[in-house]
Amino acid sequence: MASLIGAGTAARLDRVIPEQELAERPLSELFRDYVESAPERRYEVWFFNVTPPEMELALPTTDAKLNYLAHTANLASAVRYDCAGDTDGGRCVHARLLERRRERFAKILNKFLDLHQILGTIQQ
């Protein structure tokens, strides 16, 4: 529990909460037991790098990544609906690759946005 941390020190929650609890318990319970139960405790904020290396190399800034996501969504839409009424399995390999990359990148951005929302709730 939060009592594992001495007063005045800051630790990462992933090092305080046992791995089994992280896997089994819902976020709301973990928040209640480790954060709300001891509001005077301070925890470090950390980020895991979940960006694929090729994406990080080509698009080093958040703005570049967001622009890439918007561009690939537009391109995928154009490729999909450019065919004469064929909107399903008749797409070429390039269109399928673009779709997979766009989905992968969207998942990464959603993780960042989820983290931002969680941190915003903790600060309130």
UniProtKB/Swiss-Prot annotation:
What InterPro entries would the database entry show? Herpes_TT2
Which keywords appear in this protein's UniProt record, sorted alphabetically?
Host nucleus, Viral genome packaging, Viral release from host cell
Main subcellular localization, coarse class? host cell
According to its UniProt entry, the protein's GO biological process terms are:
viral DNA genome packaging
Indicate whether Transferase appears among the record's keywords: no
**Subcellular location, record wording:** Host nucleus
The answer to keyword Transferase applying to this record is no
Looking at the UniProt record for this protein, which Gene Ontology cellular component terms does it annotate, in alphabetical order?
host cell nucleus
Described by its record, this protein's role is as follows: Component of the molecular motor that translocates viral genomic DNA in empty capsid during DNA packaging. Forms a tripartite terminase complex together with TRM1 and TRM3 in the host cytoplasm. Once the complex reaches the host nucleus, it interacts with the capsid portal vertex. This portal forms a ring in which genomic DNA is translocated into the capsid.
Q: Which family does it belong to?
A: Belongs to the herpesviridae TRM2 protein family.
Quaternary structure note:
Associates with TRM1 and TRM3 to form the tripartite terminase complex.
What protein does this entry describe? Answer: Tripartite terminase subunit 2
